[in-house]
Amino acid sequence: ADDINPKEECFFEDDYYEFE
């Protein structure tokens, strides 16, 4: 999770993308 939707500051995982 690096270049994803940084809409939240909780995407420091490998499978933590909250974008649908």
From Swiss-Prot:
Which example biological process does GO assign this protein?
apoptotic process
* Keywords on record: Antibiotic, Antimicrobial, Apoptosis, Cytolysis, Disulfide bond, FAD, Flavoprotein, Glycoprotein, Hemolysis, Hemostasis impairing toxin, Oxidoreductase, Secreted, Toxin
Q: Where in the cell is it found?
A: Secreted
Record EC number = 1.4.3.2
List, alphabetically, the GO terms of the cellular component aspect: extracellular region
Which coenzymes or cofactors are required? FAD
Q: Which reaction does it catalyse?
A: an L-alpha-amino acid + O2 + H2O = a 2-oxocarboxylate + H2O2 + NH4(+); L-leucine + O2 + H2O = 4-methyl-2-oxopentanoate + H2O2 + NH4(+); L-phenylalanine + O2 + H2O = 3-phenylpyruvate + H2O2 + NH4(+); L-tryptophan + O2 + H2O = indole-3-pyruvate + H2O2 + NH4(+)
GO molecular-function term, one example from the UniProt record:
toxin activity
Q: In which tissues is it expressed?
A: Expressed by the venom gland.
Bilayer-crossing regions: none
Q: What is its main location?
A: secreted
Concerning PTM, the database record says:
N-glycosylated.
Q: Origin, by domain of life?
A: Eukaryota
Member of which family? Belongs to the flavin monoamine oxidase family. FIG1 subfamily.
Assembly information from the UniProt record: Monomer. This is in contrast with most of its orthologs, that are non-covalently linked homodimers.
Q: What does this protein do?
A: Catalyzes an oxidative deamination of predominantly hydrophobic and aromatic L-amino acids, thus producing hydrogen peroxide that may contribute to the diverse toxic effects of this enzyme. Is active on L-Met, L-Ile, L-Leu, L-Phe, L-Trp, and L-Tyr. Exhibits diverse biological activities, such as hemorrhage, hemolysis, edema, apoptosis of vascular endothelial cells or tumor cell lines, antibacterial and antiparasitic activities, as well as regulation of platelet aggregation. Its effect on platelets is controversial, since it either induces aggregation or inhibits agonist-induced aggregation.
Q: Know the name of this protein?
A: L-amino-acid oxidase L1
Q: Which organism is it from?
A: Daboia russelii
